[in-house]
């Protein structure tokens, strides 16, 4: 019985991995590839190839090689989390080579690199819903294949989370604009501030185009689910970073800011609040600092800039004053417990009184959701969390030409 339960637990915890093995006969977590760093790269970029080209001083060729698998070499040179370095063979000697740094050096030295020529026109048309990394990547390679591509996005500008989720201090907007313009130069048509279901229906897209690729991203916020979350001064990370992406900078001058969360988005909000004039910024996280999902360099950067990391404290409630404005965030101290499925100690409530954290602004940065409900009425099925169900990772079941 115990053995059977272990198998069941594994099937539940690693459902996607088992499904990938059964359906596609491959292992996404396999580290036995001939080139481990390439195996860890989500885009499968030829890392040894472009590193060798950088070594030879062929910077433009290095950029061209990266583009074979990833049309955003500049973006990744600035903001990639570089998982490839975890599997760099140099770790067996002393430490990984600075792969992302070499990519950054290549794109800086290469300057403007001409895009490859598109294949002969096929006469096929494709609509891409969403102008973020996924949508623009699909548009790029479809255009190279000779298809006519049109991108629709609900925001003022293209870029998705690269623009509306990552602050400009990490990725300068002029660099993002240049890279997007380079992609569009392949003849890709783009329409911004177009919302599907309002300005144009999904059915109209299906009728107008030979294929539709849905790449809507995760642009809705998630609630903490605590008392007082509707107080004035409580903002979501999605809202705050989205406003910053549009150039609408909030004024935190002299204010006390509390950020809830421990991921990269929480660090982006924390460090942005410091830059926006906050008098004091506290990042409240229910686990230990070493359990944060944010990159260590981002956490260390936030601390170096004067932010406080209040760990092992779970948000309990938000206190509002008589006018309904945020006055404080209450947090319950935690102690570490058993290891969870992700390999991190599970936080448990400590037998001590809650802590009151004075605050004028509370930023909720605990993840994003997917606004896929607009597509469900048109036959796109979703699973928990709003993720669209697809076959072979892309094709939408029972809808021809929809991916």
Which residue ranges define each predicted feature?
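N-terminal Rossmann-like FAD-binding beta1-loop-alpha1 element of flavoenzymes
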Residues: 124-150, 266-274
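Residue-level detector of alpha-helix initiation sites
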Residues: 71, 132-133, 157, 263-265, ...
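Phosphate-coordination loops involved in phosphoryl transfer and adenosine-cofactor binding
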Residues: 122-125, 193, 253-257, 312, ...
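Rossmann-like dinucleotide-binding cores of NAD(P)H-dependent redox enzymes
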Residues: 148-151, 155-186, 190, 242, ...
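Ferredoxin-type iron-sulfur electron-transfer modules and their immediate structural context
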Residues: 1-125, 173, 212-230, 320-326, ...
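FAD-site-proximal beta/loop scaffold in flavoenzymes
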Residues: 230-255, 339-403
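Conserved hydrophobic helix-helix packing surfaces used for dimerization/oligomerization
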Residues: 126-128, 149, 257, 281, ...
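A conserved short coil-to-beta-strand element within the FAD-binding core of flavoproteins
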Residues: 192-206, 312-324, 335-337
């Amino acid at each position: 019985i115990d053995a059977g339960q272990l198998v069941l637990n594994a099937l539940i915890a690693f459902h996607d991995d088992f499904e990938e093995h059964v359906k596609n006969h491959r292992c996404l977590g396999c580290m036995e590839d001939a080139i481990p760093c390439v195996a860890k790269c989500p885009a499968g970029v030829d890392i040894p190839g472009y590193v060798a080209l950088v070594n030879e001083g062929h910077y433009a060729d290095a950029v061209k090689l990266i583009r074979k698998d990833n049309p955003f070499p500049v973006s990744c040179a600035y903001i990639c989390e570089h998982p490839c370095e975890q599997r760099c063979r140099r770790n067996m000697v002393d430490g990984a080579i600075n792969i992302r740094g070499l990519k950054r050096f290549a794109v800086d030295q290469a300057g403007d690199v001409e895009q490859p020529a598109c294949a002969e026109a096929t006469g096929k048309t494709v609509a891409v819903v969403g102008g973020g990394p996924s949508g623009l990547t699909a548009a790029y390679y479809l255009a190279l294949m000779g298809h006519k591509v049109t991108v629709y996005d609900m925001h003022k500008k293209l870029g998705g989370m690269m623009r509306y989720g990552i602050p400009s201090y990490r990725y300068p907007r002029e660099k993002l604009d240049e890279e997007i313009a380079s992609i569009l130069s392949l003849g890709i048509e783009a329409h911004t501030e177009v919302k599907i279901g309002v300005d144009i229906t999904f059915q109209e897209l299906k009728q107008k185009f030979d294929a539709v690729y849905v790449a809507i991203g995760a642009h809705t916020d998630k609630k903490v689910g605590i008392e007082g979350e509707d107080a004035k001064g409580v903002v979501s990370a999605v809202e705050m970073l989205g406003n910053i992406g549009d150039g609408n900078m909030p004024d935190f001058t002299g204010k006390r800011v509390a950020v809830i969360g421990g991921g990269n988005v929480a660090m982006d909000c924390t460090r942005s609040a410091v830059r926006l004039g906050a008098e004091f910024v506290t990042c409240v996280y229910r686990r230990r600092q070493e359990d944060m999902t944010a990159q260590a360099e981002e956490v260390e950067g936030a601390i170096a800039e004067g932010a406080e990391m209040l760990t092992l404290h779970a948000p309990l409630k938000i206190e509002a004053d008589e006018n309904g404005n945020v006055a404080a965030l209450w947090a319950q101290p935690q102690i570490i417990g058993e290891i969870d499925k992700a390999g991190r100690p599970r936080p448990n409530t400590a037998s001590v009184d809650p802590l009151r954290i004075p605050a004028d602004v509370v930023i909720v940065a605990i993840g994003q959701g997917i606004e896929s409900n607009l597509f469900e009425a048109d036959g796109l099925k979703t699973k928990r969390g709003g993720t669209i169900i697809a076959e072979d990772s892309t094709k939408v079941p029972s809808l021809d030409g929809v991916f």
